[in-house]
Amino acid sequence: MSDHPPEVMVNGRAYRWPAAPTVVICLDGSEPGYIETAIDKGLAPHLARLMREGANFAALSVIPSFTNPNNLSIVTGRPPSVHGVAGNYFLDPATGEEVMMNDARFLRADTIMKGFADAGARVAVVTDKDKLRALLGKGHDF
């Protein structure tokens, strides 16, 4: 008997519980040809194995095609009009200042990772972009 649900609902969508541990790698702003060339030259053997033995997809981006809206659409399963992060920055009309949208208060939708964590999955979020740390980790204890 399984100790987890067969699927998890997040933002109105059902996600099946993975049959095996799952890793999602998002290479933001990377032209697929760069990865293919690195693999062909033997410079990325681990990526070659992941692509050969796992699954890989060239993602379709959302508009606007900036880091924050796209990454958050991937992890929420919803467009910027729903998750609330429509750019990397916005202009604050009260101050006339540009505000970086890197604070979790701007995110209006739960992440798929949070949905699975709430259902009992062990979840980790790793990013080298400080601006994404709070957004991707919203609702987690790390």
Named regions from a protein language model:
Residues 2-21, 29-142:
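Active-site nucleophile/metal-coordination loop of metallo-enzymes that catalyze phosphate/sulfate
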